[in-house]
Every structure is written in structure tokens, then in C-alpha cells.
Regions:
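Polytopic transmembrane helical bundles with strong interfacial aromatic enrichment
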Residues: 2-182
Length: 182
């Protein structure tokens, strides 16, 4: 029994470490997209040099940190469920968490698509739209952390209202930042 508990704690620790790495990669990746997009509207020499550098940085960040962290997050998360499936698979908060994780995985792959579009100069989004895209990952982080920490003590009505309030607050902050920059 001690080995199972110790094994679970190690798996849980690794899961948390790779969640942190995954989110760090997603946050920084979209930040690179914003800089990359802004560089694409600059003078030709600057655009060429900076775009090439951003492409290298994006490629390394995506394939060395972000995507492996996603895979390991899912692997260790699934391992935790296997080790304690009697508990996790009966918990409503876990079902909702898994839904958010699925949406986060879709966000991950759409972010990869954005990377290819921006590198081919086909992305039609503005830097402000990319900032809003970046805040969506923040919403996933807030939702997942609150679900895991508060579990069933969370009043779902307050949780839902709070989730949308955070989203609205982030949108307002991005809009204010845009006005401040102008």
C-alpha cells in the first residue's frame, strides 16, 4: 500500500510540474506570436530578420517544451486516474476538469495552427486578437485550478459566474491595454 501511495504522489508531482511547463509554453508562445505579428508590419529589413528569429524561437518552444509538456501532462494525469479510478471517475468535478482539459488540448492544437499561419504570413488576426487568444489559456488555468482545489465544495453557480467574470475582466484589461498603447 505504501508503494501505491508513494507512486501516486510522485505521479501527481510530475503531473503538476508538466502542467506548469505546458501553460508556461502556451503563454509564452502566444506572446511570441504577438511580437512576431508586430514585426511583420515593420520595415522590410527588420521584418525579415525578426520574423526568422521568431520562427526559430517558436519552433523550439513548441516542439521542445510545450508539446512534450502537454503529452506528459496527459500521460501523468491518466496515470493518476488509473491509480485511483474508483475515486476520480465518480467525481462530477473530475468530469468537468476533463472537459476543460479536452478544450485545452484543442486550444493547444489551434495554437499550433496559428504558428503555421503566422510563419507563412497568412494569419489575419491582429496583435490585439492574439492577446485575447492568450487570455483564453488564462481562463482554462483558472477554471482547472479552482475545480481541482475546491472540488465539490465549489458552488457551481458561483463558479460559472466567476469564470465568466474573470473572462470579462481579462477582455476589459486587453482593451484598456490597447487604448493605453495607442
Amino acid at each position: 500500500m505504501y508503494f501505491c501511495t508513494m507512486s501516486f504522489d510522485i505521479v501527481k508531482s510530475l503531473h503538476i510540474i508538466f502542467v506548469v511547463c505546458w501553460f508556461a509554453g502556451l503563454f509564452y508562445m502566444v506572446r511570441l506570436f504577438i511580437y512576431h505579428k508586430e514585426a511583420q508590419i515593420g520595415p522590410v529589413d527588420e521584418k525579415t530578420i525578426l520574423s526568422k528569429q521568431f520562427e526559430i524561437m517558436e519552433h523550439k518552444l513548441w516542439w521542445i517544451i510545450t508539446t512534450p509538456s502537454m503529452v506528459l501532462t496527459v500521460l501523468f494525469g491518466a496515470w493518476m486516474i488509473v491509480l485511483n479510478h474508483e475515486y476520480y471517475l465518480t467525481q462530477p468535478w473530475m468530469h468537468l476538469k476533463l472537459l476543460f482539459v479536452l478544450l485545452l488540448i484543442l486550444y493547444h492544437f489551434f495554437t499550433q495552427r496559428i504558428m503555421y499561419l503566422i510563419q507563412s504570413e497568412s494569419l489575419r488576426w491582429s496583435s490585439t486578437q492574439l492577446r485575447l487568444w492568450n487570455e483564453l489559456a488564462t481562463l482554462f488555468l483558472v477554471a482547472i485550478v479552482f475545480l481541482v482545489v475546491l472540488k465539490s465544495t465549489l458552488n457551481w453557480l458561483y463558479g460559472t459566474v466567476g469564470f465568466f467574470a474573470v473572462g470579462l475582466g481579462l477582455m476589459i484589461a486587453v482593451r484598456m491595454y490597447k487604448r493605453f498603447r495607442s
